[in-house]
């Protein structure tokens, strides 16, 4: 039986930290579904479709990685993919408490799906999509934080937002 994992997240945008976890997960599991959360309570910078497109581009070198979106409960999505594992990255101890709550709830919902935590490579321990967006918004250098295609998408997105703001005033 193939080992299948789901690596969930909002990926708004995907960073080198995310890619580190996906790449390492793809070495451990036969199949990894990168599941882009369609969270209606958040107002993302990129649409789900844009995030999927960027993720597909940057995960192209990994033949056993499939990028899709999902809504609803993660365990339901994992079950629909016959996944026995959820793969999560941890940057710091501060991530652990939140992740333990989610893991405990997922275990209540389906005790057959295990959660695996991978410590993010130390060079990405500080990295978050929020930080990347904040730096990019002010034209800071993000080339060490995100792949080139993501950097370009961020520059275009903020240029269009700035242009729209000027047109509205």
Curated annotation (Swiss-Prot):
It is found in: Cytoplasm. One of its GO terms (cellular component) is cytoplasm. It catalyses: (R)-4'-phosphopantetheine + ATP + H(+) = 3'-dephospho-CoA + diphosphate. The keyword ATP-binding applies. This is Phosphopantetheine adenylyltransferase. ATP binds at residues 10-11, 18, 89-91, 99, 124-130. Belongs to the bacterial CoaD family. It comes from the Bacteria. SUPFAM superfamilies: Nucleotidylyl transferase. Its cofactor is Mg(2+). Keywords: ATP-binding, Coenzyme A biosynthesis, Cytoplasm, Magnesium, Nucleotide-binding, Nucleotidyltransferase, Transferase. The record marks 18 as: Transition state stabilizer. It comes from Geobacillus sp. (strain WCH70). GO terms for biological process: coenzyme A biosynthetic process. Substrate binds at residues 10, 42, 74, 88. Its EC number is 2.7.7.3.
